[in-house]
């Protein structure tokens, strides 16, 4: 996912300069959500959202000189990782004016392009306004409403969980003084190397500016952790996908050994970059999701995800990830697989094994722990809400046919109705900049507590 500007300040004064200078104060937009109890009683929680540090203005500690401009570091302020962390400070965010982020009650709206800014990624904050809200997903369910009607081919409105540190990495890394309050500490299963700071140090050493993304590049380090994609979607296609890693906590990786999207060898790292995805279209049910389909993406929909454990406890082994939709007052079960050799309408260990075999995919999911590995990470996850475009494969893996050179009629290749490269970033950024996604009515609680479950 694409980011803009990040700080892990090395001195207390760095963050103080940001807070006390003539720059923008950091005020988190409020966002309420509901915590539910068995039986369906839900209590409003007063939360907020924080913008990921990678989007923020990074400037000299004692002034306003850019440490990072476009996709290039300032050679004087950032000659190496350590010096850059000492010399550069993080600024607060004008959420609406600069980033197109607005909240109203329990609703969060993200605009794709606002001025020079492209996309955004935010995290739900705890009520202390200093740390990320964490969730134990085991034996619980997570529900939210989404309006993806304005997201065309090539855009992705994503709701997902990652194993970030709740404090943004402050306790582990003494040079990180900004912390969760400024959106630090991101990681995911791609072991992203486009992050400008990781583990309290800059990522300038080995940095290569992107040829296609005017704001991004790839550095010498990446940041890895398990990722549970609840909802990756536009108006054409949607998928939910667990991505396990060998470690349940955030770790830093080196160069191409990171694997994932940003490295020459995709499967070289300690995480599963592919995951075990359930995309109804890819599973042969082409009439399930989209405009005027069974789940009608032209209208808001409630998305329910349940994390079933083998023994029915909050510490049990993850055995199944179930999906329901609620729209027009009706509960809609997830689409059933229509692929030969693959049965079911939920993610289980058997489903994942059968799917990889049917599609001829390497079972990287199993190599990194499979469903059990994902379950091992679910006891403390941070909620991420974003909108982004894809400079690596134009989102074809979500809404078109992918791999691009594969036979589109072969099992697992077609993922949606978008034409190849309909989602090229240059095209969507110029033609669909006003696209928005709205997430609202977030609920979390025991199985069956956040919606009227079918008998």
UniProtKB/Swiss-Prot annotation:
Its EC number is 3.2.1.91. One of its GO terms (cellular component) is extracellular region. It catalyses: Hydrolysis of (1->4)-beta-D-glucosidic linkages in cellulose and cellotetraose, releasing cellobiose from the non-reducing ends of the chains. InterPro entries: ConA-like_dom_sf, Glyco_hydro_7, Glyco_hydro_7_sf. The keyword Ubl conjugation does not apply. GO terms for molecular function: cellulose 1,4-beta-cellobiosidase activity. Residues 1-17 form the signal peptide. GO terms for biological process: cellulose catabolic process. It is found in: Secreted. Glycans are attached at residues 81, 285. Pfam families: Glyco_hydro_7. The active site is at residues 227, 232. Keywords: Carbohydrate metabolism, Cellulose degradation, Glycoprotein, Glycosidase, Hydrolase, Polysaccharide degradation, Secreted, Signal. Its main location: secreted. The keyword Mitochondrion does not apply. PANTHER family: 1,4-BETA-D-GLUCAN CELLOBIOHYDROLASE A-RELATED (PTHR33753:SF6), 1,4-BETA-D-GLUCAN CELLOBIOHYDROLASE B (PTHR33753). Belongs to the glycosyl hydrolase 7 (cellulase C) family. The biological conversion of cellulose to glucose generally requires three types of hydrolytic enzymes: (1) Endoglucanases which cut internal beta-1,4-glucosidic bonds; (2) Exocellobiohydrolases that cut the disaccharide cellobiose from the non-reducing end of the cellulose polymer chain; (3) Beta-1,4-glucosidases which hydrolyze the cellobiose and other short cello-oligosaccharides to glucose. This is Probable 1,4-beta-D-glucan cellobiohydrolase A.
């Amino acid at each position: 996912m694409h980011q803009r500007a990040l700080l892990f300040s090395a001195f207390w004064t760095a963050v103080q300069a940001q807070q006390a200078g003539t720059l923008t104060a950091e005020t988190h937009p409020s966002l309420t959500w509901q915590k539910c109890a068995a039986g369906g009683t839900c209590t409003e929680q007063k939360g907020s959202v924080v913008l990921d540090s990678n989007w923020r203005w990074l400037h000299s500690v004692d002034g306003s000189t850019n440490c990072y401009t476009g996709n290039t570091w300032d050679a004087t302020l950032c000659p190496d990782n350590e010096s850059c962390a000492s010399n550069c400070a993080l600024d607060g965010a004008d959420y609406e004016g600069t980033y197109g982020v607005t909240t109203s009650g329990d609703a969060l709206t993200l605009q794709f392009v606002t001025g020079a800014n492209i996309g955004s990624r935010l995290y739900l904050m705890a009520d202390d306004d200093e740390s990320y809200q964490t969730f134990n997903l085991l034996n619980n369910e997570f529900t939210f409403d989404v309006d993806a009607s304005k997201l065309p081919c090539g855009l992705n409105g994503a709701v997902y969980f990652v194993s970030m540190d709740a404090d943004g990495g402050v306790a582990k890394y003494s040079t990180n003084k900004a912390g969760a309050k400024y959106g630090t500490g991101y990681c995911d299963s791609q072991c992203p190397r486009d992050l400008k700071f990781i583990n309290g140090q800059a990522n300038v050493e080995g940095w290569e500016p992107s040829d296609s993304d005017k704001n991004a590049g790839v550095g010498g380090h990446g940041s890895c952790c398990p990722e549970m994609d609840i909802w990756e979607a536009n108006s054409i296609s949607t998928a939910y996908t667990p991505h396990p890693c060998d470690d349940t906590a955030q770790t830093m990786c080196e160069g191409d050994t990171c694997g994932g999207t940003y490295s020459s060898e995709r499967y070289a790292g300690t995480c599963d970059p592919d995951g075990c995805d359930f995309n109804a279209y890819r599973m042969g049910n082409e009439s399930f999701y989209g405009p005027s389909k069974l789940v009608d993406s032209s209208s808001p929909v409630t998305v329910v995800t349940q994390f079933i454990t083998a023994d029915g406890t909050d510490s049990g082994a993850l055995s199944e990830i179930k999906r329901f939709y609620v729209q027009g007052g009706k509960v809609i079960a997830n689409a059933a697989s229509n692929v030969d050799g693959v049965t079911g309408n939920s993610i289980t260990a058997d489903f994942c094994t059968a799917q990889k075999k049917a599609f001829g995919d390497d079972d990287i999911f199993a190599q990194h722990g499979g469903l059990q590995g994902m379950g091992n990470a679910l006891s403390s996850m941070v909620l991420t809400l974003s909108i982004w475009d894809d400079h690596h494969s134009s989102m074809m893996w979500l809404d078109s046919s992918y791999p691009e050179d594969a036979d589109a009629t072969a099992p697992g290749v077609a993922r949606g109705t978008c034409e190849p490269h309909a989602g090229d970033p240059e095209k969507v950024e110029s033609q669909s900049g006003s696209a928005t996604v709205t997430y609202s009515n977030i609920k979390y609680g025991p199985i069956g507590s956040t919606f009227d479950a079918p008998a």
